[in-house]
UniProtKB/Swiss-Prot annotation:
Job description of the protein: Catalyzes the synthesis of alpha-ribazole-5'-phosphate from nicotinate mononucleotide (NAMN) and 5,6-dimethylbenzimidazole (DMB).
Lineage: Bacteria, Pseudomonadati, Pseudomonadota, Gammaproteobacteria, Pseudomonadales
Record family assignment: Belongs to the CobT family.
One Pfam family named in its UniProt record: DBI_PRT
Coiled-coil annotated spans: none
Protein EC: 2.4.2.21
Domain of life of the organism encoding this protein: Bacteria
Name of the coding gene: cobT
Protein name: Nicotinate-nucleotide--dimethylbenzimidazole phosphoribosyltransferase
Length: 351
């Protein structure tokens, strides 16, 4: 690939705004540190937005969808037709993320990168059709170089559209039957873990199904000879269209100064790929929750991430990130609207 835009510099955090926010936190009518993670969250958002009192009113959600050839190996509890059917559900308003987006008054964009139904043509969906799903990575590379570049660019384009709409926070979601297998294969490569440690039930596999899934991943890793220091090659060989688009979106957000709220296991794997491709993007990634997939805890630890929630979620779609938005908004409201000791005429703790 000649156009490696993902290596471009990311925006720095505004340390002066963070210092101002930190000083404000120490003046608010509460014991310092008593609001726990919410205090650090407000301070970090101040650095990301370049203002002492950040707000998160404008939220952009993009769902990236794509099918996976590795489903041929019997690694999913659901048929591939569900991917296309869920695209219809997203835009008709019946999916979980559709409901959450309405409640949050967030924009919702749906991008079809390539499903097994090439005739799919849904109003309200951006159909890019990079292929009828990825190749079966148990037997061949998941993507060609051209497909990988196009998927990364699709994510970048979505992030730029969010910026044009005035977004203050970007949430990427995903849909693709078989994508926990692709995500686990990527994570195993980048973290150097055996597949059995990172393979989970996904949409509902039983214990035998999970063992088979791990075996498929292990065989694929041997086939492709992937290395932890080659994240782009790993993404192309065992990733997915939607995972690559998430990577592109996260990197573009960091390069253009838009905070990202990362969803669950699959999105966290995309975040790990993004960080390995361009470590400067890491400060721009906030992590919404620790999900039910057994590998998510280790993945978050590898990212040095402190998730906001732990609700046992395993839906995907960006739903866990959307659920964390009210908490972020409240953290900003507390930071911006609480009185200082001086304003409230309340005695502060003696120095």
């Amino acid at each position: 690939m000649t156009q490696m835009w993902w290596r471009d510099a990311c925006q720095p955090l505004d340390t002066a705004a963070m210092d101002q926010a930190r000083a404000r936190q120490q003046q608010l009518t509460k014991p310092t540190g008593s609001l726990g993670q919410l205090e650090g969250l407000a301070i970090r958002l101040a650095g990301l937005q370049g203002r002492e009192r950040p707000t998160v009113e404008q939220v952009a959600i993009t769902i990236f969808a794509g099918d996976h050839g590795v489903v041929e190996e019997g690694i999913s509890a659901y048929p591939q037709a569900v991917t296309g059917q869920m695209l219809r559900n997203f835009v008709s308003g019946g999916a979980a993320i559709s409901v959450l987006a309405r409640q949050l008054e967030a924009s919702l964009e749906v991008v079809d990168l390539g499903t097994v139904d090439p005739s799919l043509d849904l109003p309200g969906v951006r159909h890019l059709r990079l292929g009828a799903g990825t190749g079966n990575f148990a037997r061949q590379a998941a993507m060609t170089d051209a497909q990988l570049a196009a998927a990364l660019q699709a994510g970048r384009d979505s992030a730029l559209r969010a910026l044009e709409r005035g977004a203050q926070l970007f949430i990427g979601g995903e849909m693709g039957i078989g994508n926990t297998t692709a995500a686990a294969a990527l994570a195993c490569t980048l973290m150097g873990c055996p597949a059995r440690e990172l393979s989970g039930p996904g949409t509902g596999l039983d214990s035998a199904g999970v063992r088979h899934k791990a075996e498929v991943i292990e065989r694929a890793l041997v086939l492709h000879g992937l290395r932890a220091d080659e994240p782009l090659r790993a993404l192309g060989h065992v990733g997915g269209f939607e995972i690559a688009a998430l990577v592109g979106a996260y990197l573009a957000c960091a390069q253009h100064g838009l905070a990202v709220l990362v969803d669950g296991f699959i999105c966290s794997v995309a975040a790990l790929v993004a960080v390995r491709l361009n470590p400067q993007c890491q400060p721009w990634l906030l992590f919404a929750h620790q999900g039910a997939e057994p590998g998510h805890k280790a993945l978050l630890a590898a990212l040095h991430a402190e998730p906001l929630l732990a609700l046992g979620l395993r839906l995907g779609e960006g739903s866990g990130a959307a659920l964390a938005v009210p908490l972020i908004r409240l953290a900003c409201a507390l930071h911006g609207q609480m009185a200082t000791f001086a304003e409230a005429a309340v005695a502060d703790r003696p120095a």
